[in-house]
Amino acid sequence: HHLKTLAEAYGLTGNLTYAQKAIEELSDWIDHVHAPSLYDEQGNLAPLHFDGLSPWRALEVGIRGYRTWPLIIELLADTPCFTEEFQQKLYQSVQLHCKILYEISPLLWPKADHNHYLMENLGLMALSCLFPEMPDSAKYLSHSQQELDRCMEAQCTPCGGQIEGSPSY
C-alpha cells in the first residue's frame, strides 16, 4: 500500500515527485503483474486462481478497489502525471478488477459469511461508483449492494457486532 502513501505525500506537500512515482509504479504494476485466467482449462470459472497468496487474491483485488486506488485517483487525477494513456490503462485494469470481484468472489464465499467477501464487495461498489461509465457499472453496483446486505445478515450478531469479534470489522 505504499502507493497510497506516495499519493498522500503528494496531497500533503504538493511535491510532484511523489505523484510521478506513484503513477509510474502503478503503471508498471499494471503492465507486469498479470491476473490469472478467470477460467480453467475446461472453460469454467476458476475461483481457486484467486484464493492463494498472490497480488490477485480476491481480497487484494477488493482492497485495491475501495482502499487504495480510489484515493490515488482522488489525489492524483488533476496532476500532469495522470495522463490520458495512464487513465486508459487504469480503466482497463479497473474493468478487470470488477469482473473478478463480480464473477469470482461469490464462488469463493457463497454464504457471504467472511470478512474477505465484505471487503471484496466494498471494492466492487467503490469502483462501480468511481467509474459509472463502465458498461457493467450499474450491474456491479446493484450486485455489490445485494451482497453487502447478505454480508450484514451473515456476519453481524443480533446486537450489531461482527461475528469474528474484531473491533475493526
Please place each PLM-identified region on the residue numbering:
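Aromatic-lined, polymer-binding surfaces characteristic
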Residues: 1-169
